[in-house]
Structure formats: structure tokens, C-alpha cells
């Protein structure tokens, strides 16, 4: 079925909402199962462990607050909790996406075919196996781009005052952008668009992608809802690709 989407781009909030609708479309649900199972097993277990550690980590993080900011501790405490959830939420999400990357790519490909009526290359288990080395190389490129920037932000967390006030905001913005890259890359990679070219394309609609990534980041922190976020984000990002980028970058039509 060809999508009824218009070619006019919408907001990132719109595409995130579309992801929740598209994930349950007939013919798409079977491609959602494996990414969903990976996410439920990993994110469910990881966040259960994380919440058991908060009582230890939050006081440690708050110990870096200087004496002159102690009067703000009632505000800094929730910021510290959010900071831990953001950092580890993205870390857990990255691991889940590495494991599920071949299946996320297949989900993006099949959804794009349904939305556009285009014919994708031959797929199946052998097609996935053949593409695994290329897909893992692409995941490594994303990780190599992310890691040095994340280290700088983590160092900022240990600067008294700044680490408890400015760093959580910077990390949220960085996480939003990185999650937009993570999920939008699946349809781009299906069309063999180079990683650098993909990032350049996303920057042309930076506000839209930041909106999409911000909502994805927020939902990654919410128990239960974060179990479903991976296939939802893949579907939303694929809808954005169809509307905003496909005309210029598509390899198959």
C-alpha cells in the first residue's frame, strides 16, 4: 500500500507519533517482533538493574555539589536522577541497537516499501546475513563519532556546579541528536548513503531531527514505554526519510 504521506515535511513530534501508528500496520508487525524482543529483554533487565543502583549513585553524584550550591539541592537532586537515566538510557539503547541492527534495517526497508510502493532488493535471512559485516561497520562508525563527544560531556559532569546544572542539559541535547542519527540512519544505510553524507542531510532539518530525537530520548527513560521504543523510533525515522530525504538519496525506487 502506498503511503498517503504528503511530500511536505512535518515536525519531529509528528514523525514520532507516526512511529506508534506504523509499528502496528498489517504486514509490518512480523518485522517488528525481533527488534521488540531484543529491546524488551535488554532494556527491561538493564533498567531494573539501574533503578537498584540509584540509591548509591545519586548521593555520590550530589557530593560534587559545592557548598555554595547546597541551597539548590532540592532542584539538583532530580537533575542528578535525570542525568543518570539519560546517560545509562542511551548506553543501554546503543547496545540494544547494535544487537538488533540487522533487523532494524529490515524493518525500515519493508516499511519504506509499503509507504512508497517501491520494490526493495531481495531480502530474507540470507540477505541479512550477507549484510551483517556492512551493518556492523556502520554501527561502529556511529559509535566512533559518538564516543569522544560523550567522554567530553561526562568529564563536564565532574566539574563542581557546572556538572550538576549545565551538564544534564547538554547531555539531553546531545542524546537527542545522537538518537536522531541512530534511528534515521537505518533507511539511509539501506540505500548505501555514506555516514558523513547522512549527517549532513540531517543537519539540513536539524530542528525536526532534534524534536524527534528529544521525544525518543524522553521515552527511553520511561519504564514500560521504553520497552517498545526501538521499533517505534525505526518506523518514525523511516516515515521521515520517505517525506524529507528519499527523493534526493534513494538508491532503489
From Swiss-Prot:
Transmembrane segments: 31-51, 75-95, 151-171, 222-242
Function: High affinity, high specificity proton-dependent sulfate transporter, which mediates sulfate uptake. Provides the sulfur source for the cysteine synthesis pathway.
Protein name: Sulfate transporter CysZ
Pfam families, sorted: EI24
Membrane topology: Multi-pass membrane protein
UniProt GO molecular function: high-affinity sulfate:proton symporter activity
Subcellular location: Cell inner membrane
A cellular-component GO term for this protein: plasma membrane
UniProt organism field: Escherichia coli O139:H28 (strain E24377A / ETEC)
Assigned protein family: Belongs to the CysZ family.
GO BP: any one term: cysteine biosynthetic process
Record keywords: Amino-acid biosynthesis, Cell inner membrane, Cell membrane, Cysteine biosynthesis, Membrane, Sulfate transport, Transmembrane, Transmembrane helix, Transport
Main location: membrane
Classification via InterPro entries: CysZ_sulfate_transptr (IPR050480), Sulfate_CysZ (IPR022985)
HAMAP family: CysZ
Top-rank taxon, per record: Bacteria
Amino acid at each position: 500500500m502506498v503511503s498517503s504521506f504528503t511530500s511536505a515535511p512535518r515536525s519531529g513530534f509528528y514523525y514520532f507519533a507516526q512511529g506508534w501508528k506504523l509499528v502496528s500496520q498489517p504486514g509490518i508487525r512480523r518485522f517488528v517482533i525481533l527488534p521488540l524482543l531484543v529491546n524488551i529483554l535488554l532494556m527491561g533487565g538493564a533498567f531494573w538493574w539501574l533503578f537498584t543502583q540509584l540509591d548509591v549513585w545519586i548521593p555520590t553524584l550530589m557530593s560534587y555539589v559545592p557548598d555554595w550550591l547546597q541551597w539548590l539541592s532540592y532542584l539538583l537532586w532530580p537533575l542528578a536522577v535525570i542525568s543518570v537515566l539519560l546517560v545509562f538510557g542511551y548506553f543501554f539503547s546503543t547496545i540494544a541497537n547494535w544487537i538488533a541492527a540487522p533487523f532494524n534495517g529490515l524493518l525500515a526497508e519493508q516499511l519504506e516499501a509499503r509507504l512508497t510502493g517501491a520494490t526493495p532488493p531481495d531480502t530474507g535471512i540470507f540477505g541479512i546475513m550477507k549484510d551483517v559485516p556492512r551493518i556492523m561497520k556502520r554501527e561502529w562508525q556511529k559509535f566512533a563519532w559518538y564516543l569522544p563527544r560523550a567522554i567530553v560531556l561526562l568529564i563536564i559532569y565532574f566539574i563542581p556546579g557546572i556538572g550538576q546544572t549545565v551538564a544534564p542539559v547538554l547531555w539531553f541535547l546531545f542524546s537527542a541528536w545522537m538518537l536522531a542519527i541512530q534511528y534515521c540512519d537505518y533507511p539511509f544505510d539501506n540505500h548505501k548513503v555514506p555516514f558523513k553524507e547522512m549527517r549532513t542531510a540531517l543537519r539540513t532539518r536539524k530542528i525536526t531531527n532534534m524534536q524527534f530525537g528529544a521525544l525518543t530520548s524522553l521515552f527511553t527513560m520511561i519504564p514500560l514505554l521504553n520497552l517498545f521504543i526501538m521499533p517505534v523510533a525505526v518506523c518514525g525515522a523511516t516515515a521521515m526519510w520517505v517525506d524529507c530525504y528519499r527523493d534526493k538519496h534513494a538508491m532503489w525506487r
